[in-house]
């Protein structure tokens, strides 16, 4: 039975956090292959990319496996990497987009992996297997308009608003690196207020105090949160260490795939363990997690549950999901087994079916690298297609 009154906390990190710098670089490379492939006459279905990035003081290392056009050279990749770092905003002595050393260690995808992903299976036509085994979770709830848990939704929103002000030139003394954390108070199972707010934000003027940083960030925090959620009892922690001048990869080494809870539901739902960034959609760590969110969101959007957790499982080289599991946490209007059957009916959950339904063979991934992969708005270029609620009516009919 779900608790009625409790506190729940989630964190977010900005695009300038060292791990997020790496996620952005890895996803820029995936996008590069999808942009350049069609120009070289390569079918987007044949593109493969698995890119891992490490970033530290004045150094970026990229390693992984790819399959795509020969036109994507190391020089091309280096240019994309520098432009990404520039866009994030790093022009400091210890990490500058112009001068950091970039080492590229990409090589062709393993033939052993390729044969499992590309090969036809007996009795199936043009069906590709999953790129790896694993379990993936999707989640949705009716706590926010985007059907996301309130703590992670507002933690992202705080940093996104500050980042917009920084990029526009309004907040010139704030650096790219920042973190937020929001402790939400629930009553009768509904979010009603914030008890604790944490914002740690890099500043570009070395002697800025925590109080001065608070003067800068507090208006964005108040703008992000519902008006009556902040009270006299709300506790603020703004740059609680007192100083945050050295930021980004110069202050803390970053790696791709180390913010998987920030990327998803802020701890409000299970996680299968697989990261998203740097992976093309044959990797079900990414594409099946997107599909799981899509299905869970449409179940809630259809009014069939107030909360929904959905699990998918795959085996490498096998097209069909091994299992589909749904839990509506006591909020379902129909049984979970009916929803599980409906999920298999309304969407082809093979890797190829997911890529086709969500139109994932395109350069849409760099935009996902910060502020969450879920709870975002579908865009005209095909980004965040998994956030659509166009299956809601199909679910209603199927149950």
UniProtKB/Swiss-Prot annotation:
Its cofactor is Mg(2+); K(+). Disulfide bonds: none annotated. It is found in: Cytoplasm. ATP binds at residues 17, 177-179, 243-244, 252, 258-259, 275, 279. K(+) binds at residue 52. It comes from the Bacteria. Its EC number is 2.5.1.6. Keywords: ATP-binding, Cytoplasm, Magnesium, Metal-binding, Nucleotide-binding, One-carbon metabolism, Potassium, Transferase. Binds 2 divalent ions per subunit. Coiled coil: none annotated. L-methionine binds at residues 65, 109, 252, 283. The keyword Nucleotide-binding applies. One of its GO terms (biological process) is one-carbon metabolic process. InterPro entries: ADOMET_SYNTHASE_CS (IPR022631), S-AdoMet_synt_C (IPR022630), S-AdoMet_synt_central (IPR022629), S-AdoMet_synt_N (IPR022628), S-AdoMet_synthetase (IPR002133), S-AdoMet_synthetase_sfam (IPR022636). It catalyses: L-methionine + ATP + H2O = S-adenosyl-L-methionine + phosphate + diphosphate. Mg(2+) binds at residue 19. Pathway: Amino-acid biosynthesis; S-adenosyl-L-methionine biosynthesis; S-adenosyl-L-methionine from L-methionine: step 1/1. NCBIfam families: metK (TIGR01034). Belongs to the AdoMet synthase family. PANTHER family: S-ADENOSYLMETHIONINE SYNTHETASE (PTHR11964). Catalyzes the formation of S-adenosylmethionine (AdoMet) from methionine and ATP. The overall synthetic reaction is composed of two sequential steps, AdoMet formation and the subsequent tripolyphosphate hydrolysis which occurs prior to release of AdoMet from the enzyme. This is S-adenosylmethionine synthase. It comes from Bradyrhizobium sp. (strain BTAi1 / ATCC BAA-1182). The lineage of its organism: Bacteria, Pseudomonadati, Pseudomonadota, Alphaproteobacteria, Hyphomicrobiales.
């Amino acid at each position: 039975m779900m608790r009625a009154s409790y506190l729940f906390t989630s964190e977010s990190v900005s695009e300038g956090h060292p791990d997020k710098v790496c996620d952005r670089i890895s996803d820029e490379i995936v996008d590069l292959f999808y942009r350049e492939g069609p120009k070289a006459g390569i079918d987007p279905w044949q593109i493969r990319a698995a890119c891992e990035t490490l970033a530290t003081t004045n150094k970026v290392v990229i390693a992984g496996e790819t399959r795509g056009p020969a036109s994507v050279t190391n020089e091309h990749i280096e240019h994309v990497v520098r432009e990404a770092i520039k866009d994030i905003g790093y022009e400091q002595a210890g990490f500058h987009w112009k001068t950091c050393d970039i080492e590229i260690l990409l090589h062709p995808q393993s033939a052993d992996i390729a044969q499992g992903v590309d090969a036809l299976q007996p009795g199936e036509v043009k069906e590709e297997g999953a790129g790896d085994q694993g379990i993936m979770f999707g989640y949705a709830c009716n706590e926010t308009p985007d059907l996301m848990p309130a703590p992670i939704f507002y933690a992202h929103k705080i940093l996104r608003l500050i980042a917009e002000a920084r990029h526009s030139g309004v907040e010139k003394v704030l650096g790219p690196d920042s973190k937020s954390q929001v402790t939400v108070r629930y009553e009768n199972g509904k979010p009603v207020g914030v008890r604790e707010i944490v914002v740690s934000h890099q500043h570009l003027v070395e002697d800025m105090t925590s109080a001065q940083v608070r003067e800068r960030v507090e208006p964005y925090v108040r703008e992000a949160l519902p008006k009556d959620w902040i009270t006299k009892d709300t506790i603020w922690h703004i740059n609680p260490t007192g100083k945050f001048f050295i930021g980004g990869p110069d202050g803390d080494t970053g790696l791709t795939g180390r913010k998987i809870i920030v990327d998803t539901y802020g701890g409000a739902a299970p996680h299968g363990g697989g990261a998203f960034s740097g992976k093309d959609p044959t990797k079900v760590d990414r594409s099946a997690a997107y599909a799981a969110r899509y299905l869970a969101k449409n179940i809630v959007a259809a009014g069939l549950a107030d909360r929904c957790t959905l699990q998918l499982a795959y085996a490498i080289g096998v097209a069909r999901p091994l299992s589909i599991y749904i839990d509506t946490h006591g909020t379902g209007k129909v049984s979970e087994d009916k929803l599980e059957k409906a999920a298999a009916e309304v969407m082809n959950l093979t890797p190829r079916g997911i890529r086709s339904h969500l139109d994932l063979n395109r350069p849409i991934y760099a935009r996902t690298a910060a502020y969450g992969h879920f709870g975002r708005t579908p865009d005209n270029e095909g980004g965040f297609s998994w956030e659509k609620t166009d299956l809601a009516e199909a679910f209603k009919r199927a149950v």
